[in-house]
Amino acid sequence: MRIGLFTDTYFPQVSGVATSIRTLKTELEKQGHAVFIFTTTDKDVNRYEDWQIIRIPSVPFFAFKDRRFAYRGFSKALEIAKQYQLDIIHTQTEFSLGLLGIWIARELKIPVIHTYHTQYEDYVHYIAKGMLIRPSMVKYLVRGFLHDVDGVICPSEIVRDLLSDYKVKVEKRVIPTGIELAKFERPEIKQENLKELRSKLGIQDGEKTLLSLSRISYEKNIQAVLVAFADVLKEEDKVKLVVAGDGPYLNDLKEQAQNLEIQDSVIFTGMIAPSETALYYKAADFFISASTSETQGLTYLESLASGTPVIAHGNPYLNNLISDKMFGALYYGEHDLAGAILEALIATPDMNEHTLSEKLYEISAENFGKRVHEFYLDAIISNNFQKDLAKDDTVSQRIFKTVLYLPQQVVAVPVKGSRRMLKASKTQLISMRDYWKDHEE
């Protein structure tokens, strides 16, 4: 299969979306597929250094200077997509490259799948200070964009429910982004390495450690963690909070820690190298987050893969992820966070190896790649079915094809734009996928 991934955000820009796309690319290539990334130019990268990464001329996006917006080169992108003979397009943004991906898919008459990554209600205030787009407008803009895709990947149940509330009609599948487990399991990291890091950070023997690791922005709600941590210290003083990362809200947090008089128990590390991420997770007793703006949150998965339990604000996604007390504790109101921390410090059991291994496969990049590939197959089969149905047939012939769609593909399938899906049985669909897999090899 030849796959085009369209995104406004890719490395060297650092974000959860960029990480998710690179993970997907890696897993699809392991399965033997050819993957091409269509993205924006970047001043820190030679536009032509990788022939599988097609960079479209772009400028910084006015609301987010570290993000970019493509403004020309669309016809050239279509020409390249034709040359690469793409079978399917997978868009990862609702902005310039997302619109370009949908247009190219329609020109090539191939299906387009979209991943919805961001809850924009939490971010529209950045765009002209909320004067240009209001939160109430988001659902109409998103619904309009998704009207022209063949299916949507939702990284969590939160996103699926949100899009259902928006009255998005296309098929929605919950497929959480997986992570490369080997990057976080890291058996070469020994106890002495963890002890050395804790000593370097000023953590004493016998002290528990909470780790917050993210971009330091207001939306991450680290300020709520600091407030709760101040209450925790009144009950348990042998605990430290490590805040790792950098961002526009860092100085505000440092000032808040001073005002709460907890600065001696809070350690701000600044940005840490990606190669050290697993080391920090493993050196902590708990990963903690009070963010409510995540559609999934890869840091939760990274922490579990490192063997470190999580304390976080509960939601449908995390309710499924933190399915056992050994994986951590959830809370549902900011006033409950301090209590959740204290309970976790006292009552979290050790990790059970068997239960952990099952959870790790569930959140693995391998499982993620397989499930996305299955969605691609279903969309391609459906697209071929719709093309076949569109030929000059009589009404009776169309009905016959709908009921017994067996000519070249064996089965009828889901999804076509905003149209109702024709569902095949699970057995038929698996047979059809197997047929396509055989013909890809």
Curated annotation (Swiss-Prot):
Name the UniProt key words of this record, in alphabetical order. Carbohydrate metabolism, Cell membrane, Glycerol metabolism, Glycosyltransferase, Lipid biosynthesis, Lipid metabolism, Magnesium, Membrane, Transferase
Output the SUPFAM superfamilies linked to this UniProt entry.
UDP-Glycosyltransferase/glycogen phosphorylase
Q: Which GO terms describe its biological process?
A: glycerol metabolic process; membrane lipid biosynthetic process
What's a GO cellular component annotated to this UniProt protein?
Answer: plasma membrane
Catalytic activity as recorded in UniProt: a 1,2-diacyl-sn-glycerol + UDP-alpha-D-glucose = a 1,2-diacyl-3-O-(alpha-D-glucopyranosyl)-sn-glycerol + UDP + H(+)
Report the domain of life of the source organism.
Bacteria
GO MF terms here are:
1,2-diacylglycerol 3-glucosyltransferase activity; hexosyltransferase activity; magnesium ion binding
Q: Where in the cell is it found?
A: Cell membrane
Give cofactor(s), names only: Mg(2+)
Record keyword Lipid biosynthesis present: yes
Q: Where is the signal peptide?
A: none
Q: Which Pfam families match?
A: Glyco_transf_4 (PF13439), Glycos_transf_1 (PF00534)
**UniProt xrefs under PANTHER family:** SULFOQUINOVOSYL TRANSFERASE SQD2
Functionally, this protein is described as follows:
Glucosyltransferase involved in the biosynthesis of the non-bilayer-prone membrane lipid alpha-monoglucosyldiacylglycerol. This is a major component for maintaining a certain anionic lipid surface charge density, for balancing the bilayer to non-bilayer phase equilibria and for keeping a constant lipid bilayer spontaneous curvature (curvature packing stress). Catalyzes the transfer of a glucosyl residue from UDP-Glc to diacylglycerol (DAG) acceptor to form the corresponding alpha-glucosyl-DAG (1,2-diacyl-3-O-(alpha-D-glucopyranosyl)-sn-glycerol). It can only use UDP-Glc as sugar donor.
Full protein name: Alpha-monoglucosyldiacylglycerol synthase
Q: Which organism is it from?
A: Streptococcus pneumoniae (strain ATCC BAA-255 / R6)
